[in-house]
Amino acid sequence: MKVKPGDIFECEGSFYQTIRATAKTATIRPIEGTFEGCADPYGWERKYLPVPGRFTSDPWMGRERSERGQRLKLHDSTCNGNRPELHMGYRTLALWDGAPSICDTYN
């Protein structure tokens, strides 16, 4: 699967939009997410949806890389190559599937 500009990646309630892409890399910037409600009866897990084009800053990336974008190498561990991922430090960013992203606030 080819990644193209405008594609959205997610990780635990955080969203990132692709601004440039090649066959092996993607340059991403963080975008805002909107709170959609609780995902469990106790209120620990929260659902978020992305707001495409509303760029913001991300503490994981830092201010400078948030503004100009961060280039990351694409990975795909599936046999048919249809689930691209980006690795940013220890975080794995998966291509957003359209479902709300779940952020677990229970620590």
Predicted features by range, described:
Residues 14-23:
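Short beta-strand-centered aromatic/proline hotspots
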Residues 36-107:
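Intrinsically disordered, low-complexity, charged/polar segments
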Residues 23-38:
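Basic/aromatic-rich interaction segments and small domains that mediate binding to polyanionic partners
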